[in-house]
C-alpha cells in the first residue's frame, strides 16, 4: 500500500501438467484420460498442459510423435478447449538432442565450441544449443511458434532449458 501498488484482482493461473503424472510417457489416450480426470478438479479457464513427450525428439518441434499422437495436436487442443481449459504445451526451443532430425539435417544451426556442437546440458540425454544468431535458426523458431500458437491453437507455452540461448566459455566461437 505504501508503494501505491494495487492488490491483484484477477485469479492466478492454475492447472495441470502431464509431466508430474506421466513424464514422457504420454499418448493421445493418456492425455484424454487425464483431461477426463481434470474436468472434475479444475475450474473453467484453468490450464491443461501437455508436457515433454509429444515431440519425436527434443528439437523436432514442427511435428508430433506419430506413434503417440497419430492425429497430431490440433485435435487435442480442441478437446482441451471443449473442456473449458486453456491449452498449454512444453517446448525447449533453443536446444536439440543429437538423435533429432534437426541435429542431423542442420549441423550449421548448432552453436559450436572448439569446432564441435556445444553440449550445453542434459535432461534424459545431452542437449545441444542452437545458434540464435543464425538467421535460419530464427526463422525456424518463428515457424515453431507460429505452428504451436496459430496452427495448433495452444494458448500458452512452457519454455524450458532456455540456458541454451546463453552460451558461455568457448561456445562463443
Named regions from a protein language model:
Residues 1-46:
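Carbohydrate-recognition beta-sandwich/jelly-roll modules
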Residues 44-173:
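Aromatic- and carboxylate-enriched substrate-binding clefts and catalytic-loop regions
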Amino acid at each position: 500500500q505504501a508503494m501505491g501498488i494495487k492488490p491483484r484482482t484477477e485469479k492466478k493461473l492454475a492447472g495441470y501438467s502431464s509431466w508430474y503424472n506421466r513424464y514422457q510417457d504420454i499418448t493421445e489416450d493418456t492425455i484424454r484420460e487425464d483431461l477426463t480426470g481434470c474436468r472434475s478438479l479444475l475450474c473453467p479457464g484453468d490450464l491443461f498442459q501437455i508436457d515433454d513427450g509429444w515431440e519425436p525428439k527434443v528439437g523436432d518441434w514442427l511435428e508430433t510423435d506419430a506413434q503417440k499422437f497419430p492425429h497430431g495436436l490440433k485435435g487435442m487442443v480442441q478437446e482441451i478447449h471443449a473442456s473449458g481449459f486453456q491449452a498449454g504445451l512444453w517446448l525447449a526451443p533453443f536446444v536439440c538432442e543429437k538423435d533429432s532430425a534437426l541435429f542431423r539435417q542442420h549441423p550449421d544451426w548448432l552453436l559450436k565450441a572448439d569446432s564441435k556442437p556445444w553440449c550445453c546440458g542434459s535432461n534424459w540425454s545431452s542437449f545441444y544449443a542452437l545458434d540464435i544468431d543464425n538467421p535460419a535458426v530464427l526463422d525456424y523458431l518463428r515457424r515453431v511458434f507460429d505452428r504451436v500458437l496459430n496452427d495448433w491453437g495452444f494458448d500458452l507455452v512452457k519454455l524450458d532449458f532456455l540456458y541454451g540461448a546463453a552460451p558461455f566459455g568457448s561456445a562463443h566461437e
